[in-house]
Amino acid sequence: MEKNNLNEMRKALLEAASLLQKSAKVGQGVDEAADMLMKDAIYTTTSGAFAQREHLDTQIGDITKRNTPFLDRVPKVAANGKTHEWDMVTALGSNDTAVGECGTPLENDATITRYSAQIKTYATSVKVCDLAQWAASDYFDLMNLHLEKGMRKILQDVEKKIYYGNHDGSTPNDFTGLYKLIADYAGAENTINASGNAISQTYVDNAIQVIVDKGGSPTHMFMGAKDLRDFAALWANKVVYNDPSAGMTFGYNVARFMSFAGPIEIVLDPFLTASNSPNTPNTDIFIVTMDEIALAQTEPMYRLPVYRALDLAETQTVVWNIVLELRVPQWTVCVKNLG
């Protein structure tokens, strides 16, 4: 039985190699040949029988993925100058860093640090030992699976930190989010305290008025599920959405708010929750001029070379050095403490 399987596998590989050789001459069929090689070569032996392995990275990604709407909209720009770029790079070697100059980060750890004002290094690492490599057979897929989830974790960390960062100021060299940047640099009127009351059009209009009075033109309003639900309820008796062609679809559309200063996109962000807010159990919303906000980076998220330690384990790391730039703080408002 095993001999027959080996013969079949050898035959399939020869056919794929022949097709690959032919495609090199005519410029066609490369993808088909590669698929054949992959299908017939990725096998492992279990009790003498052949079985093709199936990886669940796609399914796991679907289960764990959460949207990051702010990162999807904010411009990604290069570091603004040599000093800025140098600070980002040297953050790798600073104290209590995610990635030491002469070491490796902790396994499966997402840490945050920075070297100078507003600089932060986000990193995640995966360490796979020989035993896990043997158990997984094609262990590079196992490592990549971990890294994919690590990269998703980095994006989620950044999404949360963009809003709140180190809002209490207990660590001067930590990442500062919109909440504290507004409080520190935009003026008292740019933080509107709802004092536990629910969101209302008055709060939103007052926030827009502050931005317009200072020369801005707000473009986006970010809020969590609770506040979006309350805000939508305000219009339930005014704007009814009905799509006869879609059967029983009904409700109200809150995709945009037509304010006195023009249309503002309403964005639901799953990371704007009471547990993340400094005003928990209450929440906050942010009205921003997105054109004047940027995420500076030395380069896009990248991988460090694989490191093999003395314990015969391999470590691979993903790093992202970024800084949140709020170019005109006066054009951003936080309505905080919404009940």
Question: PLM features: residue spans?
Answer:
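Assembly/oligomerization interface modules of large self-assembling protein complexes
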Residues: M38-K127, L147, S170
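Structured segments of extracytoplasmic/periplasmic soluble domains
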Residues: K153-K161, V210, K214, L234
